[in-house]
Amino acid sequence: MSRIGNKVIVLPAGVELANNDNVVTVKGPKGELTREFSKDIEIRVEGTEVTLHRPNDSKEMKTIHGTTRALLNNMVVGVSEGFKKELEMRGVGYRAQLQGSKLVLAVGKSHPDEVEAPEGITFELPNPTTIVVSGISKEVVGQTAAYVRSLRSPEPYKGKGIRYIGEFVRRKEGKTGK
């Protein structure tokens, strides 16, 4: 039994949910998100509560049920509160700059890396070594942050690179000399 799928989604004040043949549009103070869901799952909107129902208890239906509920809840949270991921840069001379909506990273290469912000994503730099990726879509925020991190992943010997704030990087011992 999918416990996540059975939870009720409560719509906060200022958030509207429209279901048109399982193409769900969620509007809120931060923006609007639209996504198409499986036609097997029935989405019911009753006032400020949204419930999801599946036709049977097969394994496939249980997985789709829980996933649909989680994606729908992420849409509601995104348009009401938004999502953000914070990254930090460690290394001598590693720094970031903003040029319009473009993020320019100096991460020890012969050239600076430039990252164009996808639609709906904003970059913020509280200081030159901290990057905040924010937006209303949890999926796009996570993908963008993962791409920025992949430009210089933390290496295990000195720990240099771009990492999520709070991420543990396993360190290795170097070679021992004679």
UniProtKB/Swiss-Prot annotation:
Gene Ontology biological process: cytoplasmic translation
Top-level taxonomic group: Bacteria
A GO MF label: rRNA binding
Keyword Heme in annotation: no
A Gene Ontology term for the protein's cellular component: cytosolic large ribosomal subunit
Keywords: Ribonucleoprotein, Ribosomal protein, RNA-binding, rRNA-binding
Pfam families in the record: Ribosomal_L6
InterPro entries the UniProt entry points to: Ribosomal_uL6-like (IPR000702), Ribosomal_uL6-like_a/b-dom_sf (IPR036789), Ribosomal_uL6_a/b-dom (IPR020040), Ribosomal_uL6_bac-type (IPR019906), Ribosomal_uL6_CS (IPR002358)
Record text on subunit structure and interactions: Part of the 50S ribosomal subunit.
Family: Belongs to the universal ribosomal protein uL6 family.
NCBIfam families: L6_bact
Function of the molecule: This protein binds to the 23S rRNA, and is important in its secondary structure. It is located near the subunit interface in the base of the L7/L12 stalk, and near the tRNA binding site of the peptidyltransferase center.
Name of this protein: Large ribosomal subunit protein uL6
